[in-house]
Amino acid sequence: MNWLSRFVSGTRPELPAAAAAKIAQWQEGERGEQALPHFETRYVVVNTEATGLNLDKDRLLAVAAIAIEGRSLKPSNALYRPLDDDPAEGLADLLEFAGHAPWVVFNASFNRKLLERVFEARCDFEPDVTWMDLQWLMPALFPEFHTGQVRLVDWMESFGVETFQRHHALGDAYAIAQLLMAALGRAHDTGAINARSLIEIERSRRWNHRTV
């Protein structure tokens, strides 16, 4: 049985008061401006840790996030939340930390879908945020390294990126954040000066991939 089945409509328990308050505050917030230059934009790398890669069967174990502000990466500006049997508090903390900044993931087909599914099952909504997927953006910005959608470890090797622990929500988030820093630098140098430009690059690459 899917581990989220106990949270489906009709059996979903009430949210803890603290989590409900954080979610309500987030829902009242305003989305960030996508036209600001990168050094004025707060980007948040969001990553998950799960028991496996099966969206229907595997369980979300933890969420992590690292903020990049002013094109500056500080490991202390981070969030890590292991999720127990009730993920409500961890999800609420993620919303509070990430806010309405662009949420940057690597492999949205898994991480985004998993997060949206858990949010819907436990909190009865999917966060309406701007998602960006480095798995698509990196080959568009650095075709000299890879031209297709490759694994995170491949990009880490290309850039000499290291982290304190692989296959850990925060450890991999730190690696992704370092790649995002490189992506922001290359994007700025090539005239993609804001989040809106990066969104268009990703959208164009996905469209071209579908039409090939």
Short names for language-model regions:
Residues 46, 165-191:
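A contiguous, mid-protein "functional segment" used to position or interact
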Residues 50-52, 110, 136, 175:
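Short, glycine/acidic-enriched loop or turn micro-motifs at the edges of active sites
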Residues 139-177:
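Active-site-proximal helix-loop-helix substrate-binding element of RNase H-like nuclease domains
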Residues 1-32, 181-212:
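Acidic two-metal-ion nuclease catalytic site recognized across multiple nuclease folds
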Residues 122-128, 163-165, 188:
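Short, polar/flexible loop-turn hinges at active-site or ligand-entry regions and domain interfaces
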Residues 35-93:
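Conserved RNase H-like, two-metal-ion catalytic cores of nucleic-acid enzymes
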Residues 121, 140, 158, 182-186:
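Active-site catalytic microenvironments for nucleophilic, acid-base chemistry
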Residues 76-144:
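Conserved DEDDh/DEDDy metal-dependent 3′-5′ exonuclease domain
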